[in-house]
């Protein structure tokens, strides 16, 4: 029954029946471990691959000896990097040796190879001040894949693909005449025997002797018109290099460079492992009947007699004895099975080789050669080290190619099996480390080219390693990866859960992955191998569904990049679950029968039932308890962290659970976080691992606590650890990051204890929303279509209030006409508008600002104009002072308001690093306190989302018999059709728990049952059906039927109405079409589209329609006159010719039609070609060019354009700004703001 469990500082009553046998791994270890591997081994591998670099004559040799990341010389700490827009990185120093073989001279030098971005403890990178996450990528593993298609006659045609990590592909295919073809590197197909001949079997007889008699092979030989090895080589050369004169030597070197050159063809460790696994004998000959005696080549003993069935264990011994091929009988047909001849080194070498660190199988002929030639242990070990690249080749070898052909020949007889490409045994993860390694390799190979060039050009006597090495390509490759790769993403920092999920995300998109358009249904679907590895629930809705996934809670990634999941080992004889835990990859698990975590066991671990329900591949079977191999370790093993936080997940429909998982990531951190009354027990682990909470580095005693810092006296040496807390910092998503201490002075803390709460955490548990008293009741139609009716109490008591911090920046640049200046002295601005501006021209902290207020006063020099006599006089009297400047101050944008919380000023004088051409940079932070309001989106944890339709006074809400009013009313119709019954159970259990004063943990798939919930309700003194009589707050009369009332955990989502509401009277227009821009960010208008025009046409509202199509859109002159008329209170004039009409005429002229426009009196109307001509006719100054001030505040086309279609539209302004490569178009748009309307208001 229910039992107390301690989570951090809180006790939860748990309904879980399965006791966890293993700890959940650290949830962000995917990121941390991968990056550590890269620093330890990944960099080494790249340097080893590139070593040595020689020049073309071979007398200069450059070698990378060693490298180190200089951790002591990190320029800025993580915090400083965020503040200064810097990159958190350490210098990479490499010691390089240059050897001159002619003179024997050796020079060694330490070379700086650029700053290398470092990962923070939270698993993120800080690039240009922004926190970024590198998402792991799911790709096809290198290896050999077999497949079949069925032709018209219903015959199976087998095909194969040999995929390396990088290099040429080999593809085999069979046609309906049983001829097997090969394609080399996507070229035209050749009969497979040509490839076999080129690899060394000249005559037909040799081929048949080696591969065995087989009609498909015979058919291929007949199709093949070459008869010797040389002819085969020439034939391949002709296909690969058409038009070049073929010679045998060039053909041999071509094949060598295509397949047998480690620089051009790389299998990678994974590829070699998958090749050996697929092509080994053991899995292919197990349970087959031997056609001949199988004899051990080294001892001469008979391992299997003719006609005997080969068991699984025997097949492994045969494999490791170094036997290359075995003949097998299938339906009285003799089939030869050829392996790639790799063996387990420990079975061949008589002594211990664990110190050589050989983890893969090794090539038997090479090993045999070493063992035959040497006898003593030390020499053999030395030789093995020397020949590692031959024992475990990185490229494909001939034996591999023969084995793949043999596998293809064996498939029709049922020897071997075809592969499922979507199986997680055939897909692997490229995590941060490997993605970085690939980029680094690209950079180094570019650098290698430069080094080789410089070796030939420069003087060989005086040359030094420093002179040869150009670090630019390396630094550029790394920078490009972090800055613009599809897998390097701006961290989703809405709340701790969204951070954690982002770091655990797996994407099948990105370079070398799939593309959205090409990905079919199969790739996106849930696969049985996902169990315990990838969450079947959490994936985005929309075009990326199934391509972006999330790692399951207990999953981890092994050294090859395959995802593993833990299982309990079952002692099969006794049908007893042991305490031993082992991690399995997807293909290892395929042979096993796996029991569920909930399967009842007695106290000694024996199965209670004789028959046990198990999983086997995609089936669910019931088998005797003695047949079970493994057992799940936990009920939440199959889901991701976000999904594991949904209580009663087992009672929700999958598509609603998907929405629930995704919406928890969008919950805004509230002012006063509150942990859920009904939780699942994973909240604490998720918050601790997400990295938003400060944890004690060492055990000790708290000596000092304030809002800003905590000091802990260490037990070990009596020293003090200081922990600074973050106060009101802005997150990537503009939510507020604030940490509050939860320990007291004098408290004893242990290592890794949580010291303070962060955003959306409560006593160290994730707290995304609030526990709300609600009922399922309709109220006057305000719950229609999922809308929510809420009580004013939620607004007044700040229940759903959140803080949002926006950042605005202003930079003073050098222009062609002189430098911009940040100053309080701004032309044409009243003293009242400057009341909160200090003498530097920057607003004071604590000032309350509204839209249009000045944040930073800035003036820009204006072009000198021809001076009039009066101006010359003024200039003579006042000197330089009357120089013309333009007001380009930073103002609060439309619809924004708040309080200034922080100002940061960076200047050249203070030694801050600024972009070229920038002299001063000011950042203002404005905080807003947003109460819940109509139009905000809220949601429960079960995918039950809705928009607030009305805020009702507390006294009008329905109330309980004890007088407490409800806080939210939800529509009962939202439940049955959506099948998310979990929300109802949550409400019942929450109702009971709030009365009993409990916090509850009900783990997914192992939570409270219906009977337990009823028992809790009765214990709390409520009706067992969970319903209550409710009274109408307006009349005081009871409603007709009892209503389900309880506590539901409700989140406020990041889709806030304040960010979406938007209105415009006039504003910027597009350069080309002269129509208003679109969207809130551009201060655009609402598009009146085709269908809306039809609606007005249908009503016959001609004048409204004319107005919308002309003066409200692109009639340039008409809209100015209309504005003027409105201001002066006159009648609105006739519309003119819209710009789009002129475009239409130009289109017709382009078709060589002469178009004239006539008015109603059949007189020709002259169209002005250019807007400038029309402006000349107006008395007003549209552009706001400063020579004469306009009579009325007139609005005209700004050059603030988002899709800048006209190239030259913004070129002139670009000249003023010194170009640099980090410059982004967003900053450009703010520079081009010439909007008189905004300036006036």
Curated annotation (Swiss-Prot):
Catalytic activity from the UniProt record: RNA(n) + a ribonucleoside 5'-triphosphate = RNA(n+1) + diphosphate
Superkingdom, taxonomy of origin: Bacteria
Family membership noted in the UniProt record: Belongs to the RNA polymerase beta chain family.
HAMAP family noted in UniProt: RNApol_bact_RpoB
Keyword Nucleotidyltransferase: yes
Source species of the chain: Clostridium botulinum (strain Alaska E43 / Type E3)
Function recorded in the entry: DNA-dependent RNA polymerase catalyzes the transcription of DNA into RNA using the four ribonucleoside triphosphates as substrates.
Keyword Transferase in annotation: yes
A molecular function (GO) term: ribonucleoside binding
EC id: 2.7.7.6
Subunit structure: The RNAP catalytic core consists of 2 alpha, 1 beta, 1 beta' and 1 omega subunit. When a sigma factor is associated with the core the holoenzyme is formed, which can initiate transcription.
Gene Ontology cellular component list: DNA-directed RNA polymerase complex
Name of the molecule in the record: DNA-directed RNA polymerase subunit beta
GO biological process: DNA-templated transcription
Enzyme class: transferase
Alphabetically ordered keywords of this record: DNA-directed RNA polymerase, Nucleotidyltransferase, Transcription, Transferase
């Amino acid at each position: 029954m229910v039992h107390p469990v301690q989570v951090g500082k809180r006790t939860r009553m748990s309904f879980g029946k399965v006791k966890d046998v293993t700890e959940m791994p650290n949830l962000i270890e995917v990121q941390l471990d991968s990056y550590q591997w890269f620093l330890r081994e990944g960099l080494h591998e790249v340097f080893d691959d590139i070593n040595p670099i020689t020049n073309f004559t071979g007398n200069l040799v450059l070698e990378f000896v060693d490298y180190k990341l200089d951790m002591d010389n990190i320029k800025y700490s993580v915090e400083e990097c965020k503040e200064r827009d810097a990159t958190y990185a350490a210098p990479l120093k490499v010691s390089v040796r240059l050897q001159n073989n002619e003179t024997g001279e050796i020079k060694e030098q330490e070379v700086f190879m650029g700053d290398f971005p470092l990962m923070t403890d939270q698993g993120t990178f800080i690039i240009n001040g922004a926190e970024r996450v590198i998402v792991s990528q799911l790709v096809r593993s290198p290896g050999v894949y077999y497949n079949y298609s069925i032709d018209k006659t219903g015959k199976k045609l087998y095909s194969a693909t040999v995929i390396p990590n990088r290099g040429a592909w080999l593809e085999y295919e069979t046609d309906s005449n049983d001829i097997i073809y090969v394609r080399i590197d996507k070229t035209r197909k050749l009969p497979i025997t040509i490839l076999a001949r080129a690899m060394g079997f000249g005559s037909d007889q040799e081929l048949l002797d080696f591969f065995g008699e087989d009609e498909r092979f015979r058919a291929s030989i007949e199709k093949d018109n070459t008869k010797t090895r040389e002819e085969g080589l020439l034939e391949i050369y002709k296909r690969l290099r058409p038009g070049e004169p073929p010679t045998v030597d060039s053909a041999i070197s071509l094949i060598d460079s295509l397949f047998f050159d480690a620089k051009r063809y790389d299998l990678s460790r994974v590829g070699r492992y998958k090749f050996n696994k697929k092509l080994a004998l053991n899995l292919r000959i197990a349970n087959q009947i031997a056609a001949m005696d199988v004899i051990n080549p080294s001892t001469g003993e008979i391992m299997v007699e003719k006609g005997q069935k080969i068991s699984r264990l025997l097949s492994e011994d045969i494999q490791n004895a170094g036997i290359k091929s075995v003949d097998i009988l299938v339906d009285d047909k003799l089939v030869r099975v050829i392996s790639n001849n790799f063996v387990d080194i420990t079975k061949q070498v008589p002594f211990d080789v664990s110190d050589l660190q050989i983890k893969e199988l090794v090539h038997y002929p090479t090993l045999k050669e070493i063992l035959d030639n040497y006898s003593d242990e030390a020499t053999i070990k030395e030789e093995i080290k020397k020949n590692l690249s031959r024992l475990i080749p990185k490229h494909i070898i001939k034996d591999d190619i023969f084995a793949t052909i043999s596998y293809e020949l064996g498939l029709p007889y049922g020897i071997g099996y075809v592969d499922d490409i979507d199986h997680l045994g055939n897909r692997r993860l490229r995590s941060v480390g490997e993605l970085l390694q690939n980029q680094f390799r690209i950079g180094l190979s570019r650098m290698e080219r430069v080094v080789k060039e410089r070796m030939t050009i420069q003087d060989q006597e005086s040359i030094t390693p420093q002179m040869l090495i150009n670090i630019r390509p390396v630094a550029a490759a790394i920078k490009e990866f972090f800055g613009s790769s599809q897998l390097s993403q701006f961290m989703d920092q809405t709340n701790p859960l969204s951070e954690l999920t982002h770091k655990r995300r797996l994407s099948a998109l990105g370079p070398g992955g799939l593309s959205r358009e090409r990905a079919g249904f199969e790739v996106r679907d849930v696969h049985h191998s996902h169990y315990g590895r990838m969450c079947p629930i959490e994936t985005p809705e929309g075009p990326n569904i199934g391509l972006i996934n999330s790692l399951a809670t207990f999953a981890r990634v092994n050294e090859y990049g395959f995802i593993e999941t833990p299982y309990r080992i079952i002692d099969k004889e006794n049908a007893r679950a042991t305490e031993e835990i082992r991690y399995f990859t997807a293909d290892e698990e395929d042979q096993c029968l796996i029991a569920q975590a909930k399967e009842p066991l007695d106290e000694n671990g024996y199965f209670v039932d004789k028959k046990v329900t198990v999983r086997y591949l995609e089936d669910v079977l019931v088998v005797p308890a003695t047949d079970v191999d493994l057992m799940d370790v936990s009920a939440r093993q199959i889901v991701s962290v976000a999904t594991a936080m949904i209580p009663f997940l087992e009672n929700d429909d999958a598509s609603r659970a998907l929405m629930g998982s995704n919406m928890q990531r969008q919950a805004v951190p509230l002012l006063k976080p509150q942990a859920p009354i009904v939780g699942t027990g994973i909240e604490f682990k998720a918050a601790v691992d997400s990295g938003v909470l400060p944890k004690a580095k060492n055990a000790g005693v708290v000596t000092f606590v304030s809002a800003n810092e905590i000091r802990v006296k260490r037990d070990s040496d009596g020293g003090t650890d200081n922990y600074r807390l973050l106060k009101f910092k802005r997150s990537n998503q503009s939510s507020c990051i604030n940490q509050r201490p939860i320990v007291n002075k004098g408290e004893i803390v242990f290592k890794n204890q949580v010291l303070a709460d962060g955003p959306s955490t409560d006593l160290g548990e994730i707290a995304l929303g609030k526990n709300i008293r609600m009922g399922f009741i309709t109220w006057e139609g305000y719950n229609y279509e999922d809308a929510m009716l809420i009580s004013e109490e939620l607004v007044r008591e700040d229940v759903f209030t959140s803080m949002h911090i926006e950042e605005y920046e202003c930079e003073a640049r050098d222009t062609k006409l002189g430098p911009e200046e940040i100053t309080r002295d701004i032309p044409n601005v009243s003293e009242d508008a400057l009341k909160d501006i200090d003498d530097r021209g920057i607003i004071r902290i604590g000032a309350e600002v509204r839209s249009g207020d000045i944040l930073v006063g800035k003036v820009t020099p204006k072009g000198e104009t021809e001076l009039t006599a009066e101006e010359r006089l003024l200039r003579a009297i006042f000197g330089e002072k009357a120089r013309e400047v333009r007001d380009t101050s930073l103002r609060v944008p439309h619809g924004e308001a708040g309080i200034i919380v922080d100002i940061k000023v960076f200047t050249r004088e203070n030694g801050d690093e600024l972009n070229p051409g920038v002299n001063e940079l000011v950042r203002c932070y404005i905080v807003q306190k947003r109460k819940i309001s109509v139009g905000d989106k809220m949601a429960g944890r079960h995918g039950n989302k809705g928009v607030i339709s009305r805020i009702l006074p507390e006294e009008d809400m329905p109330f309980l018999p004890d007088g407490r009013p409800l806080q939210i009313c939800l529509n009962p119709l939202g439940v049955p059709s959506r099948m998310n019954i979990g929300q109802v159970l949550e409400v019942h259990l929450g109702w009971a728990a709030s009365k009993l004063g409990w916090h509850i943990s009900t783990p997914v798939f192992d939570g409270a049952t219906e009977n337990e919930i009823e028992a809790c309700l009765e214990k709390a003194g409520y009706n067992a059906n969970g319903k209550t009589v409710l009274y109408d707050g307006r009349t005081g009369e009871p409603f007709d039927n009892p209503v389900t009332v309880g506590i539901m955990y409700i989140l406020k989502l990041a889709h806030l109405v304040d960010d979406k509401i938007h209105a415009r009277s006039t504003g910027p227009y597009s350069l080309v079409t002269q129509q208003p821009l679109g969207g809130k960010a551009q201060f655009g208008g609402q598009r009146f589209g085709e269908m809306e025009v039809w609606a007005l046409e249908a009503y016959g509202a001609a004048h409204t329609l004319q107005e919308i199509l002309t003066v409200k859109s692109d009639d340039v002159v008409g809209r100015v006159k209309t504005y003027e008329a409105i201001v002066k209170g006159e009648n609105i004039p006739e519309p003119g010719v819209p710009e789009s009409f002129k475009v239409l005429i130009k289109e017709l002229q382009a078709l060589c039609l002469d178009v004239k426009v006539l008015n109603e009196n059949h007189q020709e109307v002259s169209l002005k070609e250019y807007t400038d001509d029309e402006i000349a006719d107006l008395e007003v100054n549209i552009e706001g060019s400063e020579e004469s001030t306009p009579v009325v505040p007139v609005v005209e086309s700004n050059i603030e354009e988002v899709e800048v279609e006209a190239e030259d539209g913004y070129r002139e302004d670009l000249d003023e700004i010194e170009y640099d490569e980090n410059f982004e178009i967003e900053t450009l748009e703010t520079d081009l703001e010439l909007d008189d309307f905004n300036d006036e208001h």
